[in-house]
Amino acid sequence: MELAQSSLNETTEISAGEEAVFDAGAHPLFSRMPSSVSFNKLRKRLLRQVRQALDDFGMLKGSKRWLVGVSGGKDSYSLLALLMDLKWRGLLPVELVACNLDQGQPNFPKHVLPDYLQSIGVRHRIEYRDTYSIVKEKVPAGATYCSLCSRLRRGNLYRIAREEGCDALVLGHHREDILETFFMNFFHGGRLASMPAKLLNDEGDLMVLRPLAYAAEDDIAKFAAAMEFPIIPCDLCGSQDGLERNAMKAMLSDIERRMPGRKDTMLRALGHVNASHLLDPKLFDFQSLSPEP
């Protein structure tokens, strides 16, 4: 599916009706938000991009209740705020359950997320599972914890989603996450694959949704800073993601600096695949391709 140019463009034109809906106040959690024109423009851009992703990938199809993963980072806080705002406007007909999985990392501030989620009035669940000890035991010295830690977290979130009667797990991955994953697979895995905006889990009973797929990380960072979310650092365990992802992030930043707009172009390319111009015979029947007699 080809991504609409408008879905990624800051100057997207929207209908007068939708503009009126976005201008009609905001969820109470935005009560202390900046009143500047620039922030209002940023907020509406992110709301439009989330709505576009919901529509493009049919994320609302069959959905009744979502488990929203909240780690305490800028991305998941922003995702939850935008979803709550859309729901408040009557544009998101699903129930939201925010969930944080405390994985037993050292110095994790246990009060921050419960206090914040309680203050904004969202149904939430905080669960403690000491996966950190498992990761420390299994991962060789000097290696990063992130991959195994992520897999253990995902498995627990699936379980919690089922226990909460949710039909989808909603995560805060954004445009840069998707592009970095694509190039990691491209350079290191020898395959064309990325992080899909919508995925059915292996068991076939839960969807994994990424409504921030079109949103730029820089926009999310500005939004989170303006909203003054109580950010919890992601390096409490002392382990950071490997050099591969950092290298991809640096490469993409350099390309965007030298050729502004290339990240959006790359993202559109992921939705405009021409199988006959690639080399995978499983995607295109090259064997039967021959000139007319």
Swiss-Prot record:
Pathway: tRNA modification. GO terms for cellular component: cytoplasm. Signal peptide: none annotated. GO terms for biological process: tRNA thio-modification. A motif (PP-loop motif) lies at residues 71-76. It catalyses: cytidine(32) in tRNA + S-sulfanyl-L-cysteinyl-[cysteine desulfurase] + AH2 + ATP = 2-thiocytidine(32) in tRNA + L-cysteinyl-[cysteine desulfurase] + A + AMP + diphosphate + H(+). It is found in: Cytoplasm. Its main location: cytoplasm. Binds 1 [4Fe-4S] cluster per subunit. The cluster is chelated by three Cys residues, the fourth Fe has a free coordination site that may bind a sulfur atom transferred from the persulfide of IscS. [4Fe-4S] cluster binds at C146, C149, C237. Keywords: 4Fe-4S, ATP-binding, Cytoplasm, Iron, Iron-sulfur, Magnesium, Metal-binding, Nucleotide-binding, RNA-binding, Transferase, tRNA processing, tRNA-binding. The keyword Oxidoreductase does not apply. Gene3D superfamilies: HUPs. Its cofactor is Mg(2+); [4Fe-4S] cluster. GO terms for molecular function: 4 iron, 4 sulfur cluster binding; ATP binding; magnesium ion binding; sulfurtransferase activity; tRNA binding. Its EC number is 2.8.1.-. Homodimer. PANTHER family: AMINOTRAN_5 DOMAIN-CONTAINING PROTEIN (PTHR43686:SF1), SULFURTRANSFERASE-RELATED (PTHR43686). Catalyzes the ATP-dependent 2-thiolation of cytidine in position 32 of tRNA, to form 2-thiocytidine (s(2)C32). The sulfur atoms are provided by the cysteine/cysteine desulfurase (IscS) system. The thiolation reaction likely consists of two steps: a first activation step by ATP to form an adenylated intermediate of the target base of tRNA, and a second nucleophilic substitution step of the sulfur (S) atom supplied by the hydrosulfide attached to the Fe-S cluster. Belongs to the TtcA family. This is tRNA-cytidine(32) 2-sulfurtransferase. It comes from Sinorhizobium medicae (strain WSM419). The gene is ttcA.
